Design a protein with these regions (language model features):
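Active-site microenvironments that recognize anionic phosphate/pyrophosphate groups
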Residues: 1-54, 59, 68-267, 271-274, ...
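Helical scaffold of the NTase/Pol beta-like nucleotidyltransferase catalytic core
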Residues: 238-240, 270-297
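Catalytic or ion-translocation cores adjacent to nucleophile or general acid/base/metal-coordination motifs
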Residues: 280, 289-312, 318-372, 376-379
Length: 481
């Protein structure tokens, strides 16, 4: 019954710290309002509880009656004695089941536009939003931990909040297929992403016909915090953003809802401005690493094809994880004239990567500026590298910053997005013969050594396995070729 699901969800909130004891009645009342109920009790419980309380009260002295009244008042928080208690049955691993029960009830009562994953996600995010602290409370606690304990304690609290709130849907991410592939360049991470649910045809049609809205302008804008969402934009009532200042400008810090790796975070400009790789980019990356030295942070390139999926909003990605590229050794060192204090070398990696290292980030940045400027204008016709064609620039950089012990590092990955009639999606991009595996941009995450593959490959690989075990002629099958 829905009342029991409400009790269990409030208990979950208490046990995960989303809800404080003082917020218990308030949270319960918000949930019963959402579901159109007058009370968290079923009618039978109300009658039984009233009779029992009346009998107990009549047999006690005035002071005993007062004590019983206080006990009864506390029990009325959830409508049933001892039902909502942090010490009761552990609900911390049951969120998916609790929400499913609530969503099934909502669908049965006609509270959803359609019983599909899109509308269920919109509604369960609304549910979880009722358990969330206000943004100011989250920010205050984050920075209290940052100052009084450590940056790592602050991000640990915020990461737990983002998971417990269901902003990061752990039960979906657990379904992702992950493995490691040993190569001459190191152990590469590979994942088949199953945490993004596929939209059903009705939702796709509804999104196509929905009025176009410019609010929020994109998925990274700060206006997403607390937004109810719509059929073509995810709900974010359970989302909280930590404001950070990097290189003197206001940015936001949040986690990716799909966490492709440990504590996968996104750092984004508070203004909706396009991606741009420049001097200020290097300054911002190092400023962030100085504030959060246990995290790496990098930027997608600022040109199509070699950039990420969102070029319209300036942002970085980082996290508490060491990718294969970070572990890869420098196979050839060199010294740049005038920068003898900066260690430089070419990384053993299947892409062109220059690693700069030193204790003075200003010096690293100054050398990075020179490399960027030279690469922007670099042309080598024999290697089919052109700085520009018909006025369109092609050369850019994917930069990644980190702190390693007492030194700072900056990896500069040289990128070029030139296309030809034979390779319209990019000469230095997976060619058409590989598009049955993946054809999307090779962005920051892939550059560092994590291949994020589409969900369809799960079934395709299973079909391929069955065909191989059955001894079928793979070339004779259109589906497998």
């Amino acid at each position: 019954m829905i009342q029991n699901a409400i009790r269990r969800l409030v208990r979950y909130g208490l046990q995960t710290g989303l809800v404080e004891k003082e917020d218990e009645i308030y949270t319960t009342n918000r949930l019963i309002e959402l579901f159109g109920l007058d009370s968290p009790e079923v009618q039978g419980e109300q009658a039984d509880g009233a009779a029992e309380n009346g009998a107990e009260a009549s047999g006690k002295q005035a002071d005993g009656a007062a004590q019983n009244g206080a006990e009864t008042s506390g029990k009325q928080i959830d409508g049933a004695a001892e039902e909502v208690s942090v010490d009761a049955a552990d609900e911390t691993g049951n969120l998916e089941g609790i929400l499913k029960e609530m969503l099934d009830y909502a669908a049965e009562k006609g509270m959803l536009a359609a019983d599909s994953v899109v509308y269920r996600d919109l509604f369960d995010t609304k549910i979880m939003g009722l358990l969330m602290p206000r943004p100011s409370e989250v920010i205050r606690k984050f920075y209290d931990l940052y100052k009084e304990v450590s940056p790592e304690a602050a991000t640990g609290y915020y990461y737990d909040l983002s998971r417990n709130s269901d902003y990061i849907r752990r039960y979906r991410i657990a379904r992702d297929k992950k493995w490691v592939a040993p190569t001459e360049y190191g152990d590469l991470d590979i994942t088949i992403n199953l945490s993004k649910p596929e939209k059903d045809p009705k939702a796709i049609a509804a999104a196509k016909n929905a009025p176009q809205s410019g609010y929020p302008k994109c998925l990274l804008c700060k206006e997403n915090e607390g937004y109810a969402g719509r059929v073509n934009h995810p709900a974010r009532q359970n989302h909280r953003i930590i404001p950070v200042t990097i290189n003197g400008s206001r940015w936001g810090f949040q986690y990716s809802p799909y966490v492709y790796y440990n504590e996968h975070c996104i750092v984004f400009n508070s203004e909706h401005v396009p991606m741009k790789i420049e001097h200020a980019t290097f300054c911002k990356l190092f400023d962030f690493v100085k504030q959060f030295p246990h995290y790496f942070v990098g930027s997608n390139a600022d040109l199509p094809i070699v950039g990420g999926s969102i070029l319209s909003h300036d942002h970085f990605q980082g996290g508490h994880y060491e990718f294969a590229m970070a572990k890869a050794p420098v196979e050839e060192t060199f010294r740049a004239a005038g920068f003898e204090d900066v260690e430089a070398g070419i990384v053993k990696w299947p892409m062109s990567v220059i690693r700069l290292s030193g204790t003075d980030t200003d010096r690293i940045i100054a050398l990075a500026d020179k490399i960027l400027a030279n690469w922007r204008g670099y042309t080598d016709e024999e290697a089919f590298i052109y700085a520009e064609t018909d006025g369109e620039p092609h050369n850019t950089i994917t930069p990644i910053a980190r702190k390693r012990r007492d030194k700072y590092e900056l990896d500069l990955v040289l990128r070029n997005n030139i296309t030809t009639a034979e390779h319209p999606l990019g000469v230095y991009h997976p060619h058409a013969k590989l598009h049955h595996i993946k054809k999307e941009n090779i962005g920051l995450i892939e550059v560092m050594g994590l291949a994020v593959l589409p969900a369809r490959l799960k079934q395709e690989l299973a079909d391929l396995k069955d065909a191989i075990l059955a001894g079928k002629d793979l070339r004779a099958s259109e589906e497998l070729c």
